[in-house]
Structure formats: C-alpha cells, structure tokens
From Swiss-Prot:
It comes from Pan paniscus. Keywords: G-protein coupled receptor, Glycoprotein, Membrane, Receptor, Sensory transduction, Taste, Transducer, Transmembrane, Transmembrane helix. Gene3D superfamilies: Rhodopsin 7-helix transmembrane proteins. One of its GO terms (cellular component) is plasma membrane. Belongs to the G-protein coupled receptor T2R family. Glycans are attached at N179. The keyword Transmembrane applies. Its main location: membrane. This is Taste receptor type 2 member 60. The gene is TAS2R60. The chain crosses the membrane at residues 8-28, 41-61, 89-109, 129-149, 184-204, 235-255, 265-285.
Amino acid sequence: MNGDHMVLGSSVTDKKAIILVTILLLLRLVAIAGNGFITAALGVEWVLRRMLLPCDKLLVSLGASHFCLQSVVMGKTIYVFLYPMAFPYNPVLQFLAFQWDFLNAATLWFSTWLSVFYCVKIATFTHPVFFWLKHKLSGWLPWMIFSYVGLSSFTTILFFIGNHRMYQNYLKNHLQPWNVTGNSIRSYCEKFYLFPLKMITWTMPTAVFFICMILLITSLGRHMKKALLTTSGFREPSVQAHIKALLALLSFAMLFISYFLSLVFSAAGIFPPLDFKFWVWESVIYLCAAVHPIILLFSNCRLRAVLKSRRSSRCGTP
C-alpha cells in the first residue's frame, strides 16, 4: 500500500505476479473511487451548508488524504515500470516521495484523531476526564488538524533531507544504481537514519490509535453486556448504534493495522520489492483499502443519505 521503497532495476515477468499487479491496480482504482466519493459527498455538503459535524470533518479529511495518497502511489508505480533502471532517489522519485511522506503521515494522524474522536464520543466511561473531553474535543478540531499539518511537514522535511543527501552522494561519486559502493551507502543511510525516523514517525500515531481502540471496544463490550440483561436486548436502538460503530471501527482497525505492517515490512525489507510475495501482500493490503470505503458508505448516515438521493434521482423519483 505504501509504494515507499521499490527497488528499481528488476522486472516482474512471472505470470502470477503480473496477475497480482493487475489486481492490485484494480483495487487501487476502487480505493481511489471510494475515497473520492466520500470526499466529494461530505465536501460538497460542507461547502453548501457551511457546517459539518466534527466527526464528518475528520472523515472527509481522511478520505481526501487517502485519495491523494493512492493517486501518488499509482503515479509512482507507473513511473517505476516505465523507467525500471532509474535511480531510486532521482529528482522525479524524490518529488513523489516528498508527496508520499507528507500524505502518509497525514493519513496516519487523521486516522488516529478519528479514533480518538470515536473513543471520546462513543465510549461510556464515567471518569470525569471523559466527560471533560466530550465537551472540549469538538472545539479542539482545528488545532488537531493544524497539529497534523505541522507534524507531517516536519517529518516530511527530515525524510527529504535524507533522500536528497543520498542523491547528492550519487552525483558526487558518479555511482550507478547497481554499484556496490552506492548500494552500501544507501543501505547505511536507510538503516541508521531513515528506518529509525520511520519507526518513530509511524509508531506514535499507531500507539494512540491502539489505546483508543482498546478503550472503545472495552466500553462497547460492557454496554452490550448490560443490554443483554434488559428485555429489549440487542433490539435497543443505542445497542444497535454501538454495534454499527464497532463494525466500522473494526474494519477501520484492520485497515490501519495492515497499513502499518506494510510500512514496517517495506522499511525493514522483509518482502523484496517487485517479488511475488511482495505483490501478494500488497494485494491483501489494497483489498482492505478497497473494502473500507464501502463499509463507511453504509455505516455513515450522511453518506447513506447521499446514496439514497442518487438512487432516487436515477430512478426519477422525487
């Protein structure tokens, strides 16, 4: 899903790998279309009504970052296959990497803030801190967005410095992409600079996400356990709302976890890029990315309303 460090100079000729690459591209298109629809639907409502629920603001921001991220990865994939012998840190790939680093960090932080918002608003803990956060969190939304912009920009600049230094070293020593000395310098920089920076950048939002997810699942479990003791049980509207939220959160968590693992595996070089196992893993990741927008479409009331209005307009009903 990341497309961060594809090692160029090798080609995929195996028929199975070619099929997986084709499936991967189709899944990317589905993910782009799904996130594009979410962004357009909520974005238009935001512009027309001049207001939107804080949760939906985070959702449209996440959809927009996902949409742009998928587009950048698609562009990088096309460039890699058109120019397989290009140096991984040439100006074109540096430009694409700059966009990818920013959008990747933005996606992680938007996902994290959305999980924080779900946890605070849906969880039924009686601790005074939760009651205080319920009243304050909505007003903090602009600062949450500004903080993600600042953190994403800062880490993107650090990544760009490392990438640019490797390219300058490549030009200075007239190294070839397959040169042993050049590869050793790249490996040293990637191992002792880029990899630790990536782990710090990616682990911070992931840790917050997991804490919020555990708290929310614990709260929902307690609430549904109490509901079983009532006469209405799972037919209680509040319980059904919690179940829908839990399903949406679980799909969200699966996508987040798979995305985080893909970043770590790619940075650690566990799956050799352009290898068959690499494409199998990428296909699984993008399957989650393609399914998640569909789940959001049916779990979000505003998005469901947009779908119903589109259906009614196509059928010619008022």
